[in-house]
């Protein structure tokens, strides 16, 4: 065996070379700049013995991952575009050497095969993957504001055709084994136990390239077909990205250039565009977010070790309760008991759980047997039957302080001695909910966002006497549910709702001043939010906003006083999407601004401001409030504030979050902006 640290190879009796990748002292394989010399040495040795080798299998020495991608620190270490381009060219050169070997090369894939890992696999003649749920293939570079820089933009379209390649590269989606096989990304998907044997069989085959179908050729290889596809792809992508993600145009350019000018020039363009993107502020912000998320995954929320959780209880069978029950089973793999005061509520929760599982079944993510097994993990009760076995109870009843206090008392009386009570409140102080509790140290806030299965953030809110063990336990549970938890101080609005409120209030003021509904939403969509503020009000519910705003005003002062809009809409039964009309009127899946709203609110709609001014009027109060939250210790760090805003309310990720955005603007420019807007519109813009 030739040992080169992360890369070692040997040859078996069938004259198959086995190249094993096993990065020392790391759980996951990642491609690092320092490995270039090691890979070069291994390839030199293999090429020297090529007359005695019939095929090559590339495999991982890790138990559950192939290659998770390239080490992102390599890009951060690049001082300029020239260094970034050299980095990409080095990867391209090494992978080209693998492609040029005179015998068949096979990637034997088990576990994540992402980014540079998939680009390595694409340089092989064949790809064989395990059919295990751990196995996922993808090119997620676009999510970091980059593009695949080691041949991915050139090899994937040539392998599977233009349309599916665009879908994979532009979205950064991860493919499961069945989908990868169907698309032709892999040549076989087999049980993990026989992966090596099947890979060896492929290694003994002749070198082969997949032939595109006539339809794929027509779309990919002739200029007319290509022009149609690229034109449509650019329109669709930019409609979604609104020019805020330069990686999208760069990806389209690289693929089109390669198909038009050939592989060599395509690779050159790929390296150039990779280097340009690596230097953009958008990529820097997205990579910073990636590092923040990676760092946060290691944190427990406190110094205490979390308790083991097997059984979870949920109080309330509504949308929130049903969603919490679902992720506790489907993601966290817990057994759940859900309690509601009547069977209708329980039925709603069962249906909610079933419908989401059935969606997974239809997408072939789970089998029918797995669906049935996960349905059996949910038990519904109308009394406190079985609560003695529950480790954590998550309360998701109405926003009523007395009711929540009653739930605390009942659970601590009916449950096990050390049961944790987590309240999913969006506005009520956790300390007040814990008043009179037998064990206040076991009470904590756990604020989910709707819809639970889609929204990634959870706010963990300890009150003054919540124990460290309680904090670390619910943080661990939230992570198991697939959530990103941030620990925030017990104060009105916590963090996310507190910074959202002034943003929404400013949008309402703009509406009352005559800015049309669709113009307001478009302005913030252009800024980078996934949903405009008026649409968001409809989604959340006008009545919910009306309940939260007075609480914030009472606790935090006049700057949270909301315009006189909400009650008028509520009196007219305009609660938003759930009642089919709010600011918009909803017909099936379509919506349009309801012109009657203008009459109701005595508004003459006429746009007076630029979209940029509209956006800044809404965003600046949010930034000011975020800074106050940090100064008051509501959040522990700028990092937590950025993550909370991005994953809780959709603050534009390419800006890095409110604090990264403020740092990018600079203290002087931000202060000038605030003063200018304060002079025009009022003191609420002054920090």
Swiss-Prot record:
Q: Which EC number(s) does UniProt give?
A: 4.2.1.17, 5.1.2.3, 1.1.1.35
What is the purpose of this protein? Catalyzes the formation of a hydroxyacyl-CoA by addition of water on enoyl-CoA. Also exhibits 3-hydroxyacyl-CoA epimerase and 3-hydroxyacyl-CoA dehydrogenase activities.
* Region called 3-hydroxyacyl-CoA dehydrogenase, residue ranges: 307-687
Q: Which SUPFAM superfamilies match?
A: 6-phosphogluconate dehydrogenase C-terminal domain-like, ClpP/crotonase, NAD(P)-binding Rossmann-fold domains
Q: Where is this protein localized, as stated in its record?
A: Cytoplasm
Q: Where is this region: Enoyl-CoA hydratase?
A: 1-191
What is any Pfam family matched here?
Answer: ECH_1
Query: Transmembrane segments in this chain: where?
Result: none
Q: Where is this site: Important for catalytic activity?
A: 119, 141
- The highest taxon in the source lineage is Bacteria
The answer to whether UniProt assigns keyword Oxidoreductase to this entry is yes
According to its UniProt record, which protein family does this protein belong to?
A: In the N-terminal section; belongs to the enoyl-CoA hydratase/isomerase family. In the central section; belongs to the 3-hydroxyacyl-CoA dehydrogenase family.
Single Gene Ontology BP annotation: fatty acid beta-oxidation
- Claim: Isomerase is one of the keywords in the record: yes
Q: What keyword terms does UniProt attach to this protein?
A: Cytoplasm, Fatty acid metabolism, Isomerase, Lipid degradation, Lipid metabolism, Lyase, Multifunctional enzyme, NAD, Oxidoreductase
Name of the protein in its database record: Fatty acid oxidation complex subunit alpha
Q: Where is the signal peptide?
A: none
**Pathway of this protein?**
Lipid metabolism; fatty acid beta-oxidation
What would be an example GO MF term here? enoyl-CoA hydratase activity
Q: Name one GO cellular component term.
A: cytoplasm
This chain is encoded by the gene named fadJ
Q: Describe the protein's quaternary organization and the partners it interacts with.
A: Heterotetramer of two alpha chains (FadJ) and two beta chains (FadI).
Q: Which reaction does it catalyse?
A: a (3S)-3-hydroxyacyl-CoA = a (2E)-enoyl-CoA + H2O; a 4-saturated-(3S)-3-hydroxyacyl-CoA = a (3E)-enoyl-CoA + H2O; a (3S)-3-hydroxyacyl-CoA + NAD(+) = a 3-oxoacyl-CoA + NADH + H(+); (3S)-3-hydroxybutanoyl-CoA = (3R)-3-hydroxybutanoyl-CoA
Q: Which InterPro entries match?
A: 3-OHacyl-CoA_DH_CS, 3-OHacyl-CoA_DH_NAD-bd, 3HC_DH_C, 6-PGluconate_DH-like_C_sf, ClpP/crotonase-like_dom_sf, Enoyl-CoA_hyd/isom_CS, Enoyl-CoA_hydra/iso, FA_oxidation_alpha_subunit
Write down the species.
Aliivibrio fischeri (strain ATCC 700601 / ES114) (Vibrio fischeri)
């Amino acid at each position: 065996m030739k040992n080169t640290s992360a890369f070692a190879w040997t040859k078996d009796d069938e004259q198959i070379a086995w190249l094993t990748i096993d990065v020392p002292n790391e759980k996951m394989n990642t491609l690092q700049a320092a490995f270039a010399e090691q890979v070069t040495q291994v390839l030199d040795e293999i090429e020297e013995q090529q007359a005695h080798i019939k095929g090559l299998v590339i495999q991982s020495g890790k138990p559950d991952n192939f290659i998770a991608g390239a080490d992102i620190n390599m890009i951060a270490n690049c001082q300029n575009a020239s260094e970034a381009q050299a980095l990409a060219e080095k990867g391209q050169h090494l992978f080209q050497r693998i492609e040029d070997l005179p015998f068949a090369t096979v990637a034997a894939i088990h576990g994540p095969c992402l980014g540079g890992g998939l680009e390595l696999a694409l340089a092989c003649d064949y790809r064989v993957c395990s059919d295990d749920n751990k196995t996922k293939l993808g090119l997620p570079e676009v999510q970091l504001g980059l593009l695949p820089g080691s041949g991915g933009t050139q090899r994937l379209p040539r392998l599977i055709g233009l349309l599916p390649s665009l879908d994979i590269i532009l979205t950064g989606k991860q493919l499961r084994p069945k989908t990868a096989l169907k698309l032709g990304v892999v040549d076989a998907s087999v049980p993990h136990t026989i992966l090596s044997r099947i890979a060896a069989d492929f290694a003994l085959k002749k070198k082969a390239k997949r032939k595109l179908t006539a339809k794929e050729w027509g779309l990919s290889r002739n200029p007319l077909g290509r022009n149609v596809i690229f034109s449509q792809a650019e329109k669709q992508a930019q409609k979604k990205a609104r020019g805020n993600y330069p990686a999208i145009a760069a990806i389209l350019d690289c693929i089109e250039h390669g198909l038009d000018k050939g592989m060599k020039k395509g690779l050159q363009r790929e390296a150039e565009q990779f280097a340009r993107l690596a230097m953009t502020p958008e990529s820097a912000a997205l990579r910073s977010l990636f590092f923040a998320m990676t760092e946060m995954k290691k944190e427990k929320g406190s110094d205490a070790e979390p308790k083991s959780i097997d059984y979870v209880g949920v109080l309330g069978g509504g949308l929130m309760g049903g969603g919490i029950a679902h992720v506790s089973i489907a993601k966290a793999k817990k057994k759940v008991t859900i309690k509601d005061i009547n069977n209708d509520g329980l039925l709603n929760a069962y249906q909610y759980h079933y419908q989401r599982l059935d969606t997974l079944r239809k997408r072939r993510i789970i089998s029918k047997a797995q669906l049935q097994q996960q349905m059996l993990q949910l038990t519904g009760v109308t009394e406190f039957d079985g609560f003695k076995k529950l480790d954590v109870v998550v309360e998701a009843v109405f926003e009523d302080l007395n009711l929540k206090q009653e739930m605390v008392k009942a659970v601590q009386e009916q449950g096990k001695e050390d049961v944790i009570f987590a309240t999913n409140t969006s506005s009520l102080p956790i300390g007040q909910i814990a008043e009179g509790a037998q064990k206040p140290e076991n009470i904590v806030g756990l604020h989910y966002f709707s819809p639970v299965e889609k929204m990634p953030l959870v706010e963990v809110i300890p009150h003054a006497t919540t124990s460290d063990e309680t904090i670390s336990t619910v943080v661990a549970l939230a992570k198991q549910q697939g959530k990103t938890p941030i620990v925030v101080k017990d104060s009105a609005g916590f963090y996310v709702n507190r910074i959202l409120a002034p943003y929404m209030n400013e949008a309402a003021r703009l509406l009352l001043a005559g800015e049309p509904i669709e113009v307001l939403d478009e302005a913030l969509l252009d800024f980078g939010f996934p949903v405009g503020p008026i649409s968001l009000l409809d989604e959340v519910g006008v009545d919910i906003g009306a309940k939260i705003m007075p609480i914030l005003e009472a606790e935090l002062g006049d700057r949270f006083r909301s315009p006189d809009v909400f009650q008028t809409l509520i009196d007219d039964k305009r609660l938003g999407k759930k009642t089919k009309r709010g600011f918009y009127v909803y017909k099936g899946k379509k919506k349009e601004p309801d012109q009657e709203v203008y009459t109701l609110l005595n508004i003459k709609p006429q746009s007076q401001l630029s979209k940029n001014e509209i956006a800044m009027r809404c965003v600046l109060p949010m930034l000011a409030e975020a800074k106050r939250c940090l100064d008051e210790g509501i959040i522990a760090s700028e990092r937590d504030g950025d993550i909370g805003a991005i994953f809780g309310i959709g603050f534009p990720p390419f800006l890095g979050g409110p604090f990264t955005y403020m740092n990018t603007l600079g203290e002087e420019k931000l202060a000038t902006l605030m003063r200018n807007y304060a002079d025009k519109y009022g003191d609420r813009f002054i920090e």
